[in-house]
Structure formats: C-alpha cells, structure tokens
Amino acid sequence: MPLHHLTRFPRLELIGAPTPLEYLPRLSDYLGREIYIKRDDVTPIAMGGNKLRKLEFLVADALREGADTLITAGAIQSNHVRQTAAVAAKLGLHCVALLENPIGTTAENYLTNGNRLLLDLFNTQIEMCDALTDPDAQLQTLATRIEAQGFRPYVIPVGGSSALGAMGYVESALEIAQQCEEVVGLSSVVVASGSAGTHAGLAVGLEHLMPDVELIGVTVSRSVAEQKPKVIALQQAIAGQLALTATADIHLWDDYFAPGYGVPNDAGMEAVKLLASLEGVLLDPVYTGKAMAGLIDGISQKRFNDDGPILFIHTGGAPALFAYHPHV
C-alpha cells in the first residue's frame, strides 16, 4: 500500500469512526449532477470540523514533547482556533490564541459570538494583534513569552497546516477511497483551499489512491498565483515525509472568494441557503459556502473534466453562521 509510512507518525485518536460520505439527492436533482458530501463537519468535538484530523497528529507530537500549552493563531472567527482550544480543554492543556480581526469590523456579533464565544467557554487565553502579517514569527515570539512564564508551549501553525498536520488529510484520502470502492466512481473532488494543508494532504493521498479523480481547490483568501505555491510546498513536504513522489498538478479556482477572506459574498450566501433548504446541511460564509458556490458555478460553466459524480469536502464552520448574522 503506497501510504504505509503514515503509521510512522504518532496519532492521537480524536475522531473515532470514519466520517460519513453521503449522497445528496435533492441537490443532485437541482444541479443535474450526482453530488456527494464528505461530512467532516460532524467530527465529534466542539461542533466538529476538519481541523481535528490535523490535530490528531499535531497534538500527539505536542504530548510526545511534553508540552502543557498549545499556541496557535487565526481570525477572531477561526474554526481552527476553536477546535484547538477544545482539544486543549479535553486534554487538560492550556491554550493561547493569537487572534486578528481580518475584516476590520466593529460589529459586536462578530467580535463576541460564534467561534469567539466558544473560545471563552474553553478558557482560552486570548492575545489580540493588529494583523497576522508573519504568523510563524509572531507565534514564535508569543511562545518565547509564554515559556518565560513557566509553561512548556507547542506551536501549532495557522490552520494546522504543516506537513505533519496535513497527514490527517492524506489519511482522509484513504478513508474516501475505501468508502467509494465499488459504490461510486468519483470524477471530481471539491475542497476549500485556505491555509492549504487540507488541500495538499488530499492531493498527495488521492494521487496515489484515486489517480483519475480531479481535485479542485476553491480559494477562500488568495489568487491562484498566491495560493498555488503554498499548496505545492506542502504537497512536496508531505510526499517527502512519506517517501512518495507527488507529481499531480494543483488545480485551483479563485473566482469565488471576493471581496476577500472572511467577507461574505452573494454567491457564497446563496450556496449556504441552498444546502440548508434542500439538504438540511449547514455551510458557512467563509469557507464552505464559497467552495460550494464554486462547485455550483463549475457545473453551470462546464469547468469540470466530465459529467461524473462530484464529492464535496465539508470542512465544517457552522458556528460562524451566528457571528455573521445578519448576513445570513
């Protein structure tokens, strides 16, 4: 099996059973295409989400190093920060979150509700900054300060998107391949592409397990020119760790994130409402709404390789719906 080196990495069991892979009959009828969904939004900790797959590897490494504090960074409404804080609480670890306000809003709902509300419930230590201009350096500076206070910190990068964290999505590709075997012949997979770890991990895994499947990353914060080098760098780092080659091209669509990261747009909000009304599935305004808008428009514009079944990776994020009201 090409991914056997995955077992070399310590892993903390946080998710348990594989997440569901479901057919969406009403959305499929609406779009005239078979649409499936990978439900990483229903992972079992703190309202779910995809970052738990990365945290299984990252937090295992933190515990191996003897850390008592997890430090990470993100937007005020970061799903990654929320899931990291929840795991820290579950394990009795301290959590420090370096947060920015990427949309510059003063709306109380955004500043206090949704994921931000949950951080307080998890007793997270909040550190605000004007902007995450160099998050790796900013996290290291924060870690040095926390260490001077007597803690043993472990830094988790933005989005959990290191080569180690992205192993969680190599593992997810294996899960998808097993769930689809003799059930559905996927043509394409669509995923939101942000901090790039989820996209890169899937790229490595699917290249070796389902090489005929087209993987599309819908960007949520950057142009193709900005995002592609980030995905490729992680793709190659992951492959190197697994003693694999990674030659698959990285496909990105950047038509759906404007006006910018964390700012809702009409197409994304229409996708949120469509999935809720047709399937009872909750997307979010920042990631999955925009990625689903790409899937819908991609079908309309015939951007996919063929007319076969499409799998949408639901990475979670529903808590942000409450913070973005009244946009919703």
Swiss-Prot record:
Swiss-Prot/TrEMBL keywords: Lyase, Pyridoxal phosphate
N6-(pyridoxal phosphate)lysine sites (modified residues): K51
Superkingdom of origin: Bacteria
BP GO terms, sorted: D-amino acid metabolic process
GO function term, MF aspect, one: D-cysteine desulfhydrase activity
EC number per UniProt: 4.4.1.15
Reaction equations catalysed: D-cysteine + H2O = hydrogen sulfide + pyruvate + NH4(+) + H(+)
Keyword Heme: no
One family name in Pfam for this protein: PALP
Gene3D superfamilies for this protein: 3.40.50.1100
Family: Belongs to the ACC deaminase/D-cysteine desulfhydrase family.
Function of the protein: Catalyzes the alpha,beta-elimination reaction of D-cysteine and of several D-cysteine derivatives. It could be a defense mechanism against D-cysteine.
Protein name (record): D-cysteine desulfhydrase
Protein source organism: Salmonella newport (strain SL254)
Classification lineage: Bacteria, Pseudomonadati, Pseudomonadota, Gammaproteobacteria, Enterobacterales
The gene coding this protein: dcyD
